[in-house]
Curated annotation (Swiss-Prot):
Residues 235-403 form the Helicase ATP-binding domain. Induction: By concanavalin-A in peripheral blood leukocytes. The keyword Protein biosynthesis does not apply. Its EC number is 3.6.4.-. SMART domains: DEXDc, HELICc. GO terms for molecular function: ATP binding; chromatin binding; helicase activity; hydrolase activity. Residues 30-115 form a coiled coil. It comes from Homo sapiens. Pfam families: Helicase_C (PF00271), SNF2-rel_dom (PF00176). The keyword Oxidoreductase does not apply. Plays an essential role in normal development and survival. Involved in regulation of the expansion or survival of lymphoid cells. Required for de novo or maintenance DNA methylation. May control silencing of the imprinted CDKN1C gene through DNA methylation. May play a role in formation and organization of heterochromatin, implying a functional role in the regulation of transcription and mitosis. Belongs to the SNF2/RAD54 helicase family. It is linked to Immunodeficiency-centromeric instability-facial anomalies syndrome 4: A rare disorder characterized by a variable immunodeficiency resulting in recurrent infections, facial anomalies, and branching of chromosomes 1, 9, and 16. Other variable symptoms include growth retardation, failure to thrive, and psychomotor retardation. Laboratory studies show limited hypomethylation of DNA in a small fraction of the genome in some, but not all, patients. This is Lymphoid-specific helicase.
Length: 838
């Protein structure tokens, strides 16, 4: 039975609730309050998210910084270890030299004393080597005082040697807080002390004295002092089981240093085998250099058919030659990847990867295959350790030292300068606060050796690079605008109107509807040859009609899938898109329009005749072989004698053309494909380089320049880079300049030399002023303004071609000051007079 509620309680509440519900409405104040609460909630949530994001960024930054410090500590361990070993070895070498000198002095003194005694007393019979006479008495030869003095000296020497080595370790342990830059300076100084350049008193090569450190099996030449230093650096890495990168500038003899290192290893009793892996085009040079400098060391060119390579594999394990050692195996990247299963079972004493920047992509097959090779030591040879971004440099370091360089994201996030959107002042402030670039220099110190031509004071004339901005011609402007607007196809398709065939009903016929006489086809259509023979006459008749009906006025090369390539072709020459054809001869139309339709050709047409008149020889590089074809037409038009080199030519043709250019004074221009002629050729007969179109990778153009700016060049070299202003051509150059800036910051020209070379020992960090100069450096020193009608005036042309200051500098034998000059051609109105600003 339910409990009874108190009287009067329920009756009074129910009417009140009903009344409240009847009168409840949503007022504007309530709506405003709801909106305010919602806005406050969103603001509170936004602040929480912002706080969480800032906290996460701070924590992630701290985590990455700790990883960076850990990487630096690991690199410090290598540096300190190398330094300790090198200083110990230096002390041991010094002790050995002192002992030899004392022994020589004692022999001289003893010889003089014996000669005096011989004149007064009877001659003393010499004793045989060994311990045959047990009654041998030392007192017969030396007095008691001499014995005691020698024993005392030996005891003191042993104590000094032990204490010095102990003190070295204690000193090294006490200096754990040393920065890697100080270690680098000590390391460099130790290398210099170990390689003091003095000549062997006995050995000579072609009448010239040989450096004392040059290996005895290196008999084909005399090593330069910086090559001896490089060999000593490689020796230190090899003796301590550390891999490295030899990144000397092109033309300094990286191949010679490697050959000398292998000869030194053989001299130390290492029988091999050794493996050299590189591009196919470099293999003949490796074989020739080994034969030239170390003829006693056996080599093997591992190439050929599969059966031939199977026989060669068995010969790797056989000892050959007068030295009875395993051969130096030289092979290409492709063969190394294909025969990895056979080659990876060999225990290579030394693995050299030539053109090491080929493994800049850590995901490529080549780096995966090479990592499986069993090698005691690995060495990468590259003149361009940093080409595009830091991930490429990290890929090289990861291949050599996977235990040290194992975190790409942290490495790249800290050091990728191209990802920074801050101004130069912000970058400098960040560098002052965190010293990131300084840390990177410290980390790379033990593993990278890079010297420039200016560092080693070679007899190489100065070089200047000049960038010339060319305008667009009227035809180029039309094509360029049409390509950007994607209407270029209409320009060539509108004139070719297709004849429309109508059906009996008045509608256009479908293209697939063709009258076919099936009675001519047998009942067995599987006979394919018979079917083709029956249809072919009809196809030939249709083709003949098409060829007659369409007049050939020009050759059109239009591929709309790659707009960027079309824009580049338009900047180079509009004939790459549409080359006019002479209607009479049906050959390419070569006349003055070939020059006037391209802004770059207008520049060339002003420069080349004057260069020829002054006795210069020109290398003209282009990325496109089709562009070389048009340049050949221009040379025929102006009666310029020329040679050519591209990737499609055979080895004999290349040799013939290079010999012709280097020896024949009448050959004025050498047309070269940048990629085909960028490596392995010597064209020092030229003193002028013209880069017609720049590469996205600035190192490709630098390699091209070094074909003539190298050892053996006797004249100053000027490099002209042609750029079409305000186009994709200029964007490519600017992008390449950004990559060069990254290289200048990371692979600093005052670091990784293997010597101090004027470095301040107390300078531990990058100078902010120096960093600002790198970030805000101007790439030009002159501007020339002119109208389109006259691209370059006579006065400006004289400034452009003048190299008298370089000649004076070379004759004075003063320090070569690197300069960058740009002649910038700007479009002005016709009434504006040319102006020259300095």
């Amino acid at each position: 039975m339910p409990a009874e509620r108190p009287a009067g309680s329920g009756g009074s509440e129910a009417p009140a609730m009903v009344e409240q519900l009847d009168t409840a409405v949503i007022t504007p104040a309530m709506l405003e309050e709801e909106e305010q609460l919602e806005a406050a909630g969103l603001e509170r949530e936004r602040k929480m998210l912002e706080k969480a994001r800032m906290s996460w960024d701070r924590e992630s930054t701290e985590i990455r910084y700790r990883r960076l410090q850990h990487l630096l500590e690991k690199s410090n361990i290598y540096s300190k270890f190398l330094l300790t070993k090198m200083e110990q070895q230096q002390l041991e070498e010094q002790k050995k030299k002192e002992k030899l000198e004392r022994k020589k002095e004692s022999l001289k003194v003893k010889k003089g004393k014996n000669s005096i005694d011989a004149s007064e007393e009877k001659p003393v019979m010499r004793k045989k080597r060994g311990r045959e006479d047990e009654s041998y008495n030392i007192s017969e030869v030396m007095s008691k005082e001499e014995i005691l003095s020698v024993a005392k000296k030996n005891k003191k020497e042993n104590e000094d040697e032990n204490s010095s080595s102990t003190n070295l370790c204690v000193e090294d342990l006490q200096k754990n807080k040393d920065s890697n830059s100080i270690i680098k300076d000590r390391l460099s100084e130790t290398v210099r002390q170990n390689t003091k350049f003095f000549f062997d008193p006995v050995r000579k090569c072609n009448g010239q004295p040989v450096p004392f450190q040059q290996p005895k099996h290196f008999t084909g030449g005399v090593m330069r002092w910086y090559q001896v230093e490089g060999m000593e650096w490689l020796r230190m890495l090899w003796e301590n089981g550390i891999n490295g990168i030899l990144a000397d500038e092109m033309g300094l003899g990286k191949t010679v240093q490697c050959i000398a290192t292998i000869a030194l290893m053989i001299q130390r009793g290492v029988p091999g085998p050794f493996l050299v892996c590189g591009p196919l085009s470099t293999l003949p040079n490796w074989m020739a250099e080994f034969k030239r400098f170390t003829p006693d060391i056996p080599t093997m060119l591992y190439h050929g058919t599969q059966e031939e390579r199977q026989k060669l594999v068995r010969n790797i394990y056989k000892r050959k030659g007068t030295l009875q050692i395993h051969p130096v195996v030289i092979t290409s990247f492709e063969i190394a990847m294909r025969d990895r299963n056979a080659l990876q079972h060999c225990y290579w004493k030394y693995l050299i990867v030539d053109e090491g920047h080929r493994i800049k992509n850590m995901k490529c097959r080549l780096i995966r295959e090479l990592k499986r090779f069993n090698a005691d030591n690995k060495l990468l040879l590259t003149g361009t350790p940093l080409q595009n971004n830091l991930s490429e440099l990290w890929s090289l370091l990861n291949f050599l030292l996977p235990d040290v360089f194992d975190d790409l994201k942290s490495f790249e996030s800290w050091f990728d300068i191209t990802s920074l959107s801050e101004t130069a002042e912000d970058i400098i402030a960040k560098e002052r606060e965190q010293n990131v670039l300084h840390m990177l220099h410290q980390i790379l110190t033990p593993f990278l050796l890079r010297r420039l031509k200016s560092d080693v004071a070679l007899e190489v004339p100065p070089k200047r690079e000049v960038v010339v901005y060319a305008p667009l011609s009227k035809k180029q402007e039309i094509f360029y605008t049409a390509i950007v607007n994607r209407t270029i196809a209409n320009m060539f398709g509108s004139s070719e109107k297709e004849t429309i065939e109508l059906s009996p009903t008045g509608r256009p016929k479908r293209r697939t509807r063709k009258s076919i006489n099936y009675s001519k086809i047998d009942d067995f259509p599987n006979e394919l040859e018979k079917l083709i023979s029956q249809i072919q006459p009809e196809v030939d008749r249709e083709r003949a009609v098409v060829e007659v009906n369409i007049p050939v006025e020009s050759e059109v090369n239009l591929k709309l899938q790659n707009i960027m390539m079309l824009l580049r072709k338009c900047c180079n020459h509009p004939y790459l898109i549409e080359y006019p054809i002479d209607p009479v001869t049906q050959e390419f139309k070569i006349d003055e329009e070939l020059v006037t339709n391209s802004g770059k050709f207008l520049i060339l047409d002003r420069m080349l005749p004057e260069l020829k008149k002054r006795g210069h020889k020109v290398l003209l590089f282009s990325q496109m072989t089709s562009m070389l074809d048009i340049l050949m037409d221009y040379c025929h038009l102006r009666d310029f004698n020329f040679s050519r080199l591209d990737g499609s030519m055979s080895y004999s043709e290349r040799e013939k053309n290079m010999h012709s250019f280097n020896t024949d004074p009448e050959v004025f221009i050498f047309l070269v494909s940048t990629r085909a002629g960028g490596l392995g050729i010597n064209l020092t007969a030229a003193d002028t380089v013209i880069i017609y179109d720049s590469d996205w990778n600035p190192q490709s153009d630098l390699q091209a320049q070094d074909r003539c700016h190298r050892i053996g060049q006797t004249k100053p070299v000027v490099v002209y880079r042609l750029v079409t202003a305000n186009t994709i051509d200029q964007k490519i150059v600017e992008r390449a300049a950004a990559k060069r800036k990254l290289e200048k910051l990371i692979i600093h020209k005052n670091h990784f030399k293997g010597g101090q070379s004027g470095l301040n020992l107390s300078k531990n960090f990058l100078d902010p002023k120096e960093l600002m100069e790198l970030l805000k450096s101007r790439d030009y020193e002159r501007e020339i303004k002119g109208s389109r009608e006259k691209v370059i005036s006579d006065k400006d042309l004289e400034l452009l071609l003048d190299r008298s200051d370089l000649i004076d500098q070379m004759n004075a034998s003063g320090p070569i000051k690197e300069k960058m000059g740009i002649f910038k051609i700007l479009e002005n109105s016709e009434d504006s007079s040319p102006e020259c600003l300095f």
